[in-house]
Amino acid sequence: MASVSLRKLDKSYGALRIVKGIDLEINDGEFVVFVGPSGCGKSTTLRMVAGLESITGGEVKIGDRVVNQLPPRERDIAMVFQDYALYPHKTVRENMGFSLKVRGVSASQANASIDEAAKMLGIEHLLDRRPGQLSGGQRQRVAMGRAIVRRPQVFLFDEPLSNLDAKLRGQVRTEIKRLHQQLGTTIIYVTHDQVEAMTLADRIVILRGGDIEQVGTPDEVYNRPESVFVGGFVGAPAMNFARARVNGDRLAFSDGNSLPMAAIRPSRETGLEGRDVIVGIRPEHFGPAEGFDSQLAVSVQVVEPLGSDTLVHFSLGDAALTARMPPQLRPTPNEELRIGVDPSKVHLFDATTERSIH
């Protein structure tokens, strides 16, 4: 196991700067997930750690070694890819043990490592099969087993679940988390899926346009987003946003609705009077009007019953918002509805910078 340090890490292709001076410390044994939209630099950063991509500037340190100039085989890392990268003509056992064979590990020692990893992943019965005889989920487990037998200091996962269907993604995601609990090895994991990030990570690194937008635990990035981007990216359905103005002790929306400032966390900040802000409210922080002192009068647009709850889409001024409501609440489209809000859960962001007002 080892810590990983990224210092002023930079990557450019000609005049195009992809990764913009990232600073990040990953602790020994930590599970860190890089998440963000396509083109944000997450996979490029991972590939620089792996040695598969040259570094334009800055430093990558694994343990106590600066590895900028080291080839991948000398970095003591193991990588799991999206497309499995298995040899089709080799058995599962041969695929899992190939790197050990190249390193000159004895057959008995290699087989012991393979058997241990296969048992951990529940694929002992597949060891004599070839990749063409396996399902997608089984192939991904083999790819993970191939990484495990190397006993690296750091595991690198590059969108390993993208080729799997929703059910398999959930199963393999659980196995990856259990694997980390058993091995305790440092993991850097790249995904575009915020659900994977929230369920797997000790800490999440949210990237945007080659910069780090926020680093924090799943709880921190969900409940204390530092920007509109983070608030809207993390959570499903996404955080709702609407523009408002601070008028005295009220947060006033353009359609005449308002909320009390006293219960909103940033209200103790000075200089908010008359200020335009972006209001962020998560769907689950709405509720039936009778359960809340603070209420909004809204017009229902669309209703989506989900069994366990109901998603109610409505307009608030010029904004379209979504509320997660109890399953028994079934308003009709175009109905005028009073909806409750928990003001202590309301987030305020600067209308210009879109950064959180703490």
UniProtKB/Swiss-Prot annotation:
Pfam families: ABC_tran (PF00005), OB_MalK (PF17912), TOBE (PF03459). It comes from Agrobacterium fabrum (strain C58 / ATCC 33970). Its EC number is 7.5.2.-. Keywords: ATP-binding, Cell inner membrane, Cell membrane, Membrane, Nucleotide-binding, Sugar transport, Translocase, Transport. One of its GO terms (cellular component) is ATP-binding cassette (ABC) transporter complex, substrate-binding subunit-containing. Belongs to the ABC transporter superfamily. Its main location: membrane. GO terms for molecular function: ABC-type transporter activity; ATP binding; ATP hydrolysis activity. This is Sulfoquinovosyl glycerol transport ATP-binding protein SmoE. It is a peripheral membrane protein. The keyword ATP-binding applies. The keyword Transferase does not apply. The complex is probably composed of two ATP-binding proteins (SmoE), two transmembrane proteins (SmoG and SmoH) and a solute-binding protein (SmoF). It comes from the Bacteria. GO terms for biological process: carbohydrate transport. Part of the ABC transporter complex SmoEFGH involved in sulfoquinovosyl glycerol (SQGro) uptake. Responsible for energy coupling to the transport system. It is an enzyme of class 7 (translocase). CDD domains: ABC_MalK_N (cd03301).
